[in-house]
Amino acid sequence: PLYSSAASDVYKRQDYDNTLTYTEEALRLCQPMPPVPDANQEAIRYFMSEGGIFSVATGRAKPAFERVAADVPMNGPTILFNGAAIYDFPAGKYLCEAFLPDEAKDCIQQVIGALPFSAVELYHDNNDIHALQPNDVTRRHLHITHSPTVFVDSMTEVPSPISKALFSTEPENQPALLDFLRAQPWYDRYE
């Protein structure tokens, strides 16, 4: 836990004004897990009551995270899409967004065309998700996130803007996917 009775005196002596703390939550959502422990919630609430700003940074899209957002005490904006967006849940609006450039669609199509074992999930800020060439990894991931997804046959069917592209393949094919990506002249333009 973040907070324990042994550490309580230390926490209570801190000045948290203008202190921003983010936590990364991916493991919490990957499997059914219990809610944030009471002791952790107490520590977070204390931190916020003393002027601290607390929130979450996640690779998840807004619809996947908003189902659990109410269970996490936060008073700061949430980082979504692996950093491509900052969202204010209480205000219900994006504060900042960075989209993939339109030419990314051609790059994605090249990967999918060259590697039939690879799939890609495409995330949009309006909560839409598209999947191109879905595989078992895609289906397992969508089962975990419970996000409605539109399956498409080509990148021409995917609207812009795109907030995040997530390639997936079985573990034995990951080296081939990574080697292919690294060999492309556009590889360094993307994270």
Region spans (language model):
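Solvent-exposed alpha-helices and their adjacent loops that cap or buttress functional pockets
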Residues: 5, 72, 157-159
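Small/polar loops that bind or transfer phosphate-bearing groups
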Residues: 3, 56-57, 169
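Single conserved hydrophobic/aromatic residue that forms the stacking wall/gate
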Residues: 1-7, 11
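Hydrophobic alpha-helical segments, especially N-terminal targeting/anchoring helices
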Residues: 3, 14, 21, 87-88
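Active-site phosphate-binding/coordination module
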Residues: 37-138
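Asp-based phosphoryl-transfer active-site loop
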Residues: 12-29
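Conserved acidic, metal-coordinating active-site core of Asp-based
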Residues: 117-119, 123-191
